[in-house]
């Protein structure tokens, strides 16, 4: 599954496994690396963190870490909020979010409220190049109107687009896989 039409039918994991031979491979939805990096960066160990990633020209998406574990679902689809029934096509979602229009803000707020209602995370982190400080204030106001204060998570705008978190998430996952291999080797 890809936002890049040319990769939609590509079987990247199979191709990588062929090239890597017996080496372990971990491939996941990019937002899952971002949220994992943000989780580790925050020093969390048992908390729930959800990242809402809004980047121009791609579907908005979320990813969550609960108690140190990435929530990926049955086959990595967890967090793909662009597939929810928002009453508009995926192309329309991409357009309204990229434009920063009132409809785009409404879609971002609905996504945030859905995450809050389903997961009730400790923190909801916004990253990407769409949500700025002004939009973040509007999101916070809308969420505060809809959710009682005792159920509202900390809502925070990332200091950067989230790219640093992505690299940190990949690094942390690689370290864990290396440790798992060492344990497996010595057993």
Task: Go through each PLM region and give its residues.
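Phosphate-binding/catalytic loop of phosphoryl-transfer enzymes
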Residues: 1-88, 184-185
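ATP-binding/phosphotransfer module of carbohydrate and carboxylate kinases, centering on a glycine-rich
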Residues: 13, 17-23, 41-43, 88-187
């Amino acid at each position: 599954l890809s936002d890049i039409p040319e990769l939609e039918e590509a079987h990247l994991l199979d191709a990588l496994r062929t090239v890597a031979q017996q080496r372990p491979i971990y491939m996941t939805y990019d937002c899952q690396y971002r949220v994992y990096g943000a989780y580790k960066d925050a020093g969390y160990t048992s908390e729930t963190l959800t990242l809402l990633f809004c980047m121009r020209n791609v579907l908005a998406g979320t990813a969550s870490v609960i108690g140190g574990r990435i929530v990926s679902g049955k086959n990595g689809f967890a967090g793909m909020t662009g597939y929810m029934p928002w009453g508009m096509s995926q192309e329309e979602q991409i357009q309204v979010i990229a434009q920063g229009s009132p409809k785009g803000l409404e879609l971002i707020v609905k996504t945030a409220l859905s995450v809050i209602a389903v997961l009730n995370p400790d923190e909801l982190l916004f990253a990407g190049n769409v949500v700025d400080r002004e939009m973040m204030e509007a999101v916070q106001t809308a969420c505060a109107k809809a959710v009682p204060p005792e159920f509202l998570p900390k809502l925070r705008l990332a200091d950067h687009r989230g790219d640093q978190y992505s690299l940190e998430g990949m690094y942390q996952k690689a370290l864990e896989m290396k440790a798992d291999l060492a344990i497996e080797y010595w057993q």
